């Protein structure tokens, strides 16, 4: 039995069935878990934490990014496993291995898991955090399931809550990389992900992905890089909208207004990472580094 204890934090909104399945799946890692905390993002009717889970409810529905920050702050353990409500632990050894890696190497700031069907079949490699076939250092995890160091996460400021939905992982992992830490991907550490359609909107997803990529560039990219990365990321909206066949003719205007508004109000929060960190991020995206 492993000595390390962790907090499992789950964000949920209007998915009672998925949440119940996720909570039930934690039975296999009971020996690792010190506590389970659920953030209810304004579900109607309110979510039921069930069992020993501690429930935190915010009826204002501020978004899952705010929820994740709250979960990490509320955690009472050094390690925090954050899960979406439509995930499920299908292999206890995946979580055990992740805890072993992050506990054994002070340079590791986060662990990325591989996405799988409920029966354990891995998702296509194009939908994974990386194409790497062995444990590797990569730029970023995917937020559906990830393991963090609580103290480090809070020291770096956590997720930017103005992102609201989507893209917060890349922004955080870039700051983590700039602070000298690494994100390690374990391709054999599978976590079930059974996306629930409740509350999903393709046009909202597109808007927030592009908006937050623009804000990521604004906050983190050094000069002169930001002068071309910010407009380039904005223009991706049109390519993505066409490629995904999403009818959202005025989404670009919403994005432009929102980015300009946030840039004007929060320009004092701009903290560009080093050029060396940008180079390393690009290198890891092209060629993940094997992690031994």
What name fits each language-model region?
Residues 225-292:
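Non-catalytic, C-terminal membrane-associated alpha-helical segments of glycosyltransferases
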Residues 58-75:
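Glycine-rich, basic loop-to-helix element that forms the pyrophosphate-binding segment
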Residues 25, 38-48, 88:
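A conserved acidic beta->alpha catalytic loop
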Residues 145-148, 152-157, 162-190:
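A short, conserved alpha-helix in the catalytic core of glycosyltransferases
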Residues 88-123:
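Conserved donor NDP-sugar-binding/catalytic core segment of glycosyltransferases
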Residues 1-25:
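N-proximal low-complexity "stem/linker" segments adjacent to membrane-targeting elements
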Residues 80:
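Short aromatic/hydrophobic "clamp" motif used to bind/position activated sugar donors
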Residues 24-33:
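Short, acidic, metal-binding catalytic loop of nucleotide-sugar glycosyltransferases
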């Amino acid at each position: 039995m492993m000595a390390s204890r962790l907090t499992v934090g789950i964000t949920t909104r209007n998915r009672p069935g998925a949440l119940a399945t996720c909570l039930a799946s934690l039975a296999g890692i009971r020996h690792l878990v010190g506590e389970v905390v659920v953030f209810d993002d304004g579900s109607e009717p309110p979510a039921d934490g069930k069992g020993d889970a501690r429930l935190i409810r915010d009826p204002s529905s501020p978004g899952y990014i705010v929820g994740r920050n709250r979960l990490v702050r509320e955690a009472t353990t050094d390690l925090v496993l954050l899960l979406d409500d439509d995930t499920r632990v299908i292999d206890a050894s995946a979580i055990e291995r992740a805890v072993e890696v992050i506990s054994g190497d002070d340079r590791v700031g986060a662990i990325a898991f591989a996405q799988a069907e409920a029966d354990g079949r891995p998702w296509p490699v194009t939908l994974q955090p990386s194409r790497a076939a062995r444990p590797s250092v990569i730029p970023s995890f995917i937020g559906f399931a990830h393991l963090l160091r609580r103290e480090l996460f809070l020291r770096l400021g956590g997720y930017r809550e103005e992102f609201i939905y989507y893209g917060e992982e890349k922004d955080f992992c870039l700051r983590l990389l700039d602070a000298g830490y690494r994100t390690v991907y374990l391709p054999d550490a599978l976590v079930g992900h059974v996306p629930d359609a409740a509350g999903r909107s393709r046009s909202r997803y597109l808007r927030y992905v592009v908006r937050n990529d623009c804000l990521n560039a604004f906050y983190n990219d050094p000069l002169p890089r930001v002068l071309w990365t910010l407009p380039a990321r904005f223009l991706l909206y049109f390519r993505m909208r066409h490629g995904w066949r999403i009818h959202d003719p005025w989404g670009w205007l919403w994005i432009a207004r929102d980015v300009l508004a946030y840039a004007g109000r929060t320009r004092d929060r701009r903290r560009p990472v080093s050029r060396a960190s940008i180079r390393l991020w690009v290198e890891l995206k092209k060629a993940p580094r094997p992690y031994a």
